[in-house]
């Protein structure tokens, strides 16, 4: 009988913390400023989807362009590092 594959408990713990932080981010007492919202967005997208893909929104889609640019700055960042940064940002936000 083959042994069960080893679970990466550190990765599982990080994923659980990330999911808890994502839920907590939706329940903050005050709305974060736009710069913080962009950080949260970019860390979340990098953690869940990896490097940015597709074309940068153009024209008058200023919000879409800002989101794309924030996410693109994280190109090459590992998903785990992005998860850790997201968790830290949410913890900081909830302390304020």
Where would I find each of the regions flagged by the language model?
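A charge-rich, low-complexity, intrinsically flexible signal that marks solvent-exposed coils, linkers
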Residues: 4, 10-59, 64-96
């Amino acid at each position: 009988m083959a042994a069960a594959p080893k679970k990466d408990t550190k990765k599982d713990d990080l994923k659980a913390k990330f999911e808890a932080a994502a839920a907590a981010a939706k329940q903050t007492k005050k709305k974060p400023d736009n710069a913080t919202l962009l950080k949260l967005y970019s860390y979340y997208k990098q953690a869940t989807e990896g490097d940015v893909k597709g074309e940068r929104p153009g024209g008058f889609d200023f919000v879409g362009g800002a989101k794309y640019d924030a996410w693109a700055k994280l190109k090459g960042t590992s998903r785990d590092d992005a998860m850790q940064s997201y968790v830290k940002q949410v913890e900081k936000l909830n302390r304020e």
